[in-house]
Structures are given as C-alpha cells and as structure tokens.
From Swiss-Prot:
Keyword set includes Membrane: yes
Organism: Yarrowia lipolytica (strain CLIB 122 / E 150)
Purpose of the protein: Core subunit of the mitochondrial membrane respiratory chain NADH dehydrogenase (Complex I) that is believed to belong to the minimal assembly required for catalysis. Complex I functions in the transfer of electrons from NADH to the respiratory chain. The immediate electron acceptor for the enzyme is believed to be ubiquinone.
GO molecular function, one term: NADH dehydrogenase (ubiquinone) activity
Protein name as it appears in the record: NADH-ubiquinone oxidoreductase chain 5
Length: 655
C-alpha cells in the first residue's frame, strides 16, 4: 500500500519533470504519449486503492521528512489517504487522464505541446499533493503551486494580450485569498501548536469559539477566492482565455474544487462555528443565483459553462453550510465528470468551426455536422440539469431538498434560491443546445462546409466521460448517501445535518418541484425560441438595461476596479507620499542629514565678523559655559567630560 501511495505522487511528478528537462530531446510525440500513460497508470492505482478502502476504511499514512521543528511547532511532509482524499483523487486523476488524451488531438498543431503537457502534469501533481497532505502546511504548499501553475496555463498562449491579462487577474484574485490562508495558518499554529489534522480535529472542542470563528473565516475567504464564490468570482470567466483542455481541468477537478476541499477537510472545526456555517450557506446561495442570472445573459460558449461551474460550486457551498458534507463531496465528484464533458464538447465544437468562434449566436444547424458531439453535450447538459437517472440527479437534487429539511426560515429561503438557480440552469443549458444545434444556421457556407467531427483522441475521452455522466451517480449513491454507509463519516463530521428529516419529512411536492420545473422550462425555452423568436427581439429599454447589467457580470468588474482597486491605489499612494516618503523620510536618514547640515551651518555662522553677531554669539557661549560649570558644581558631573566642550566653544569664539 505504501508503494501505491508513493506511485500516486511520484508518477505525476515524473510526468511533469521529464518533459521539462528532456522535452526537446524526447520530442513532442513521445512526451504526449508518455505523460498520458503515466497519468492513466496513476488513475488505475487510485481506483484500486478506492476499492481497497471500500472494504477497509483505514487511512494509510506516508511520512517523508521533517520540515521545521521550532520549540513546540513541528511541521512534517506527511501524506495520508482516507475516504475524503481518495474521493478527490478519483476526480483529479480521472479528469486529468481524460484531459491528457484529449489534448493530444486538440493541441496537435500547437508548436509548444511539450510545455503544455508538462504544465498539465505539473498541475495534476500539485493538486495531488494538496489533497494527500496530512497537515495544513502540505495543503498550503499544494495550494500555492496550483495557483502558480494556473497562471502558466491560462497564459499559455503568451502572444495573446487578453490571455496574459486574464492570467494576471486570476493569480492576483487568488493571492488575496492566499493572504487570509496564511493568516488562518498562523492562528492555527498559535492556538493548537501544530498544523496536523489529527491533533487539531481532536482538540477543536476545547478551543475558544471566537478563535475557531477567526480561523474558519480566514480559511473561508481563501476558499472563496479559489472556488470563485460571490464577491471574488471575477477571475473565473476570464480564465477561459486559456486552451479548452485547461478549462476542462481547472473547472472540473482541480483549481476551483480546492476551496471546497479545504472546507470539507476543516469540517471538524466548522461544526463548532455555527456563525461561519450561516455565512457559508448564504454566500453559496448568492453565488449559485448570481451565476445563473449572469449565464442566461451571456453568449460566449465557454464562459456560460464556466458560470455553470460557479453555480454548482455555490450548490456545494450550500451543502457545506448545511453541514451536509457528504452531499457536497458527492456533488463535487459527480460534477467533475459532466462538467469536464461539457468543456470537451465545447472544445470539439470550437475545434470544428473554421474561425474557432465561441459566440453561440454564430452557430446554429450543427446537429447534422456534429452528431457525436451533440449526443455528448446533451448528456452532460441533462446531467447538469439533474434529469432522472443521470449523475446530476443523484448529486444535486438532494442538496436542494436538504435546504428545506432543516427547519429554519433562513434555510427555507435558501431552498427557493437554490430552486430558482436550478431553473436558470435549465435555461442556459437549453440556450446552448438550441442556438448551437437546433436553430437556423447563422454562419457562412465555408464554415459549414469545413465543419467536422474531431479525431479519436478527442472523441474517446468524451465517450468515457459520457458513461460516467450517466452512471457514476447511480453506482456511487449508496456509498456516499446510503443510510448505513460510513465511508466518509469517519473523516468528516456531519453533526448538525438531519438526513432522515430531509428524506422522510419533506412532502413530494417540494421534492419533485425542481424536476418538474426543469422539464417544463426546457420545453418552454425550445418553444419560445422556435415559434416566437424572442431572443433578439427584446427592444424594451428597461429589459435591455437589466440584460446589460447581467451581461456585464452584475458590473462586478467596474465595482472592483473603481471602489477597491482604484481607491486602494490612491490610498497606497497617499500613504507612501505622506508616511513612507513623508514622516519616516524626514525623521529618518534625510531628516538626520539635514539636521546635521543645519547645525554645521549655524556653527560656521558663529565666526561671522559682524559686531552684532559676535555679541550675540559671545552671550550664547557665556551662558553655555556657565550652564556647564553649574552642572559640574551642583550635579557632580565629571569635569573631564566638560573640558572638551569648553575648549571647542572657546576655539569657535576666538578663531
């Protein structure tokens, strides 16, 4: 088992470093096949260990070496694989292996394939480090490196100015969250004296609640930035400037799920901070609703799918706010499969279009040209809409039901917000399907003449993920949601979640309402677009104003730039001008220099030849001499100290 754990970590590392150092000698063909093979082997090992954990739910630890040992603080590079970790590894390795295979076909004409595959493997490696660490320090190391790698991947096409700006936006927004992560780690180290999970979780109930609230607020802000929660979500749609395989990997199983994993791993602390749970619940509700509203007013294919990711991350956050950690984890796993399939299908569509346009208004009539892609994206969309029998139905609807089964006014309100978000999901999903495949062609003849299905490297991963999107939820539901299962219960702590209340006390109306609404809204969207053509005919100025606000992401970029970034820069400039180069500058080296220069100048003026200045200086020197003599006589000051001063004054007077 220890060898298996080592291989899960080592193989992606080899897949990253070999192309980095020997890619030019090995060639892009060998590199693409080698990296894909190593990640696939890692995936198979993960599935084997998942099977082992089902029968024997005992975590396995791997201790490497000590990093820091200061007084009572002991930090080690230790790794642990438990049920929570293996679930994350299932999503990470499965999606990463599919993305590697997909990239062989998608990036076949790119001249920098070696660098691209090395970065993909690097991303996978550091994400594995993040989830397998047995303490917050190792988690933080992986956290920082996936932020760096995301910058390198989003800005992969370095000649595109927008790609570079988007990557910078993503990394700066994440650095804001990282600052709070560091704050949380410092408080944890101060309060608990360690960063190890086992010690922290075992003693959390002994710690003052205010300190626990401070810790979890800091960690939650870090998770908000990484998982694109409302208020820190601006970077998410901008990250679509990277290649489509990057979008598939980032938004399905790696970067955006890191924040959710951090909250799940900290569940044992969260249970003692009901205030933070309430905040998490409402931030998740605002996130899922705002993402849906923005998505229905967007027209960029990849950005709509990215906003759907934000919406589903909000659903996971709602589940965490309800203390339903197993529901959040199950939805994270299921969402990884159909979201990766959505992005890959979008990439297949973009790849088949001659000018690689991403505006769905320029599509239409592609059903007969891309039937295989149509089937895959339809399966993924229906799973996202939580249609019965598909993975999303088993992972998503139970979260919406749980909000109604918690017996509080706040949770009832969140139920209707989550329900509205589910309806909006149907709206933008059907919008993609209709404008891409069902509507009349909206492009030129040459585009449709050259439209074609992609090669086997692109279609094979889509087929495999389509299988997962259909059956993974049904196969795994008893493992994660079954009444008698304890697969993840020993590693996360759902003390406040009322599973039986959710299952048996809610009326069928509230259980079936999201499903019925999804079906009716889907039919309504098709009918309205087909027979009434309202999409481009909304000429009312008030409707256009509302549409424009949501199309601009609730003008969040403008608010961020004007009220936070601009004001922050002005404030920083004023502080630098008045404090750093003002008070400190004058009291520091420059002030001392000027003081000494002025004193020297005044001493030099004592030798002036004018009668008035000579009289004044003589009077001052006389007063000084008398004062010094009084010090010697009255206060018993050593005369040896006074003699040099007297000699200097007399020399200045008679020079």
């Amino acid at each position: 088992m220890y060898n298996a754990i080592s291989l899960i970590i080592i193989l992606p590392c080899i897949s990253w470093l070999f192309p980095l150092f020997f890619g030019r000698q090995l060639g892009y063909v060998f590199v693409t096949r080698m990296t894909s093979t190593l990640i696939i082997i890692t995936t198979l090992i993960t599935y084997y260990y998942f099977y082992q954990l089902l029968g024997n739910n005992n975590p396995i630890n791997l201790e490497l070496f000590n990093y820091l040992n200061i007084d009572y603080l002991d930090i080690n590079y230790n790794f642990e694989i438990d049920a929570l970790t293996i679930t994350m590894l299932l999503a990470i390795t499965t999606i990463s292996s599919m993305v590697h295979i997909y990239s062989i076909g998608y990036m076949e004409t790119d001249p920098h394939q070696v660098r691209f595959f090395s970065l993909l493997s690097m991303f996978t490696f550091w994400m594995i480090i993040l989830v397998t660490g047995s303490n917050y320090f190792v988690l933080f190391v992986g956290w920082e490196f996936i932020g760096v790698t995301s910058y390198l991947l989003i800005s992969f096409w370095v000649t595109r100015l927008q790609a570079m700006k988007s990557a910078l936006s993503a990394v700066l927004m994440n650095r804001f969250g990282d600052a709070f992560f560091v704050l949380g780690l410092c408080v944890i180290a101060y309060v608990f004296g360690t960063l190890n999970y086992s010690t922290i979780f075992a003693t959390a109930y002994l710690i003052n609640t205010d300190l626990l609230v401070l810790i979890m607020l800091a960690l939650f802000i870090a998770a908000m930035a990484k998982s694109a929660q409302f208020g820190l979500h601006n970077w998410l749609t901008l990250a679509m400037e990277g290649p489509t395989p990057v979008s598939s990997l980032l938004h399905a199983a790696t970067l955006v799920t890191a924040g959710i994993y951090l909250l799940l791993r900290s569940a044992n602390i969260l249970e003692y901070t009901p205030t933070v749970l309430f905040i998490i619940l409402w931030i998740g509700a605002l996130t899922t609703l705002s993402a849906g509203l923005i998505a229905i007013c967007s027209n960029d294919l990849k950005r709509i799918i990215a906003l759907s990711t934000m919406s589903q991350l909000g659903m996971m956050t709602i589940a965490i706010g309800l203390s339903a950690y197993n529901l959040a984890l199950f939805h994270l796993l299921g969402h990884a499969f159909f979201k990766a399939l959505l992005f890959m299908s979008a990439g297949s569509i973009i790849h088949s279009i001659l000018n690689e346009s991403q505006d769905i208004r320029t599509y239409g009539g592609l059903l007969s040209y891309l039937p295989y892609t149509y089937i895959c994206i339809t399966i993924a969309s229906l799973s996202l809409m939580a249609m019965p029998g598909l993975t999303g139905y088993y992972t998503k609807d139970i979260i919406i039901e749980s909000t109604y089964g918690s017996y509080s006014i706040s949770n009832y309100v969140v139920y209707w917000i989550a329900y509205l978000s589910a309806v909006l999901t149907c709206v933008y999903s059907m919008k993609i399907l209709y404008l891409t495949f069902y509507s009349n062609p909206n492009n030129n003849t040459i585009t449709y003449y050259n439209a074609h299905e992609s090669n086997i490297y692109i279609t094979l991963p889509m087929f495999i993920l389509a299988i997962f999107a259909m059956f993974a939820g049904w196969i795994l539901k008893d493992i994660y949601l079954g009444v008698g299962t304890d697969f993840v219960g020993t590693h996360i702590l759902p003390n406040n979640f009322s599973y039986f209340d959710t299952e048996f006390s809610i009326t069928q109306f509230y259980k079936l309402l999201p499903l019925i609404s999804a079906i009716l809204v889907s039919i309504l969207i098709v009918v309205l677009n087909e027979f009434f053509a309202i999409v481009f005919n909304l000429n009312n100025k008030y409707i256009n104003t509302v549409y424009s606000i949501f199309n601009q992401k609730l003008v969040s970029d403008q608010i961020l730039n004007h009220f936070i970034i601009f004001k922050g820069l002005v404030t920083s400039g004023n502080i630098a001008h008045h404090v750093d180069k003002g008070s400190l500058y004058r009291l520091g080296p420059v002030g001392i220099n000027r003081l000494l220069n002025k004193a020297s100048y005044n001493v030099i003026n004592l030798s002036s030849n004018t009668r008035s200045s000579l009289s004044m200086n003589s009077m001052l020197i006389l007063i000084t001499i008398v004062s010094l003599l009084l010090l010697v006589l009255v206060m018993n000051v050593n005369f040896i100290i006074v003699i040099p001063v007297l000699i200097s004054i007399l020399y200045i007077l008679f020079s």
